[in-house]
Amino acid sequence: MSYRTGSCSRSQMRFLGIAAIAAALTWTTVSPNADEAAGMPRGADIRTMCGTKPTVLALADGFGGNTWRKTALAEMKDEASKCPNIKRLLYADAAGDLAKANSDINSLVAQGANILIIYPDFGDATLPAIRAAHEAGVVVVPYISQLSGNAGVDFDANVYANVNAGAKKWVEWMNNYIKEGTLLYFSGVAGNGFSTTVMDNLKRELAPYPKLKLLSDQFIVTNWATADAEKATAGVIAKYGKLDVFITDFGPVALGIIKGFQQAGLKVPANAGVASNNELNCVWMEAKAKGQAWPYMTLEGTTTIVRYALRRGMAIYQGTQDPDPLQIDTYVFADSFGGIDPKCDKSAPLDADLSGFLTPEQLSSVFKQ
C-alpha cells in the first residue's frame, strides 16, 4: 500500500516499504500546534544545506490524488521555502499508472530538474527510470519506500520509514499496558513484501513475551480496504471468537475492523497502529466521549518524511552536509494509556493526516484543493 492511496486498488496499494511505518521513537506528549510537535523531532535545519546554486526541485508521485499526498506536497513546499535559491518546483502525478510514472520521471528530467524526489508507489518497477534519471546527473531521492537498488548506482539516496522501530514500539506498548492476550495483524494485499516484513518484525519482537500470543503467523489480508477489512473481521470472529489486540498499518483498515466487531455486538479490542487518519481518530474521540473507547495507540508523522528527502537531496546537490539518518521514525500521535488524544478535526477531510508540521492555516489551504 502506498501511504494514503486514493481508491486503494491493488495496483496502487504499495505500502511504504512504512510506514509509514517508520532510529529513536519518542514517547512524549504531542502538542496540538503543528509548529510545536513535541513528540516528533524536526530534524536538521535545511538552511544549513541550501548552498548557493540555483535549484529546480521536482516531486514525482505514483499516485497523488488524495489528501495525504497533497499534505506531503505542502510539507515539501514549506521546507523548500527556506532556501531562496530553489527557483522552481515541478510536480507530476501518475494517477496510479506505472507507465505514466516512468514517463513522468523522464519528463521531469527533461524539464531541468536538479533534485528529483520520488514516491515510488510501484516499487522496483520504476527503478530503471529512477536509475536513468540518476545517470543523467539529477540528484534522485526516493522516499518512504526502501527500494532494492544501491545509492550511487541507481539513485543518490533513499530516505525511508523505519518499519523495525514501529513494530518494537507496538510490542512495548502492548507489554506495558495490555500485558497478555491474543493478537492479529491486519494488513494489505496477499504476499506483499511490506506486510511480510512487518509480520516478521512483530514475531521477532513478540518472542520474549509469551503472554502476548499471535493467533496466526500470517497477516490477515484486507487489501488495505475498509470493506475487505470488515469482511475479514467477520471471519476472524467466526474462527477465533475472541481477540484482545488488532494491529494495523492503515486507518481505513482499522475502521473496517471496528465496524466488524460492532456489527457482531462485540467489544472493540485494543488497537496498535500506524498511518491513521482523521476519520479513525474522530471515531475514537466520539467513543471516548461516550465512555466506550478502546485502548488505542498510533504512530504518525509520515507526511514529514518528504522534508528529510528534500534535505538530503539539497545537501547532495549543493555539496553541503545533512546529519539526519536515512531511516526515519514515526512518533506516538495517540496513546490512550499515556493520556495523548489524537487530533480530530470535523472540518477536515476524512482521510486527512493532522500529524505533520503544517500550521492550521496551511492545512486549511491543502483541504480546499
Located regions from the model:
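Extracytoplasmic "Venus flytrap"
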Residues: 36-75, 79, 83, 90-103, ...
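An alpha-beta-alpha
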Residues: 57-65, 73-78, 165-212, 216-219, ...
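Hinge/cleft segment of the Venus flytrap/periplasmic-binding protein
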Residues: 35-55, 194, 205, 301, ...
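Short beta-strand elements in bilobed, periplasmic/extracellular small-molecule ligand-binding domains
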Residues: 82-94, 184-185, 206-226, 268
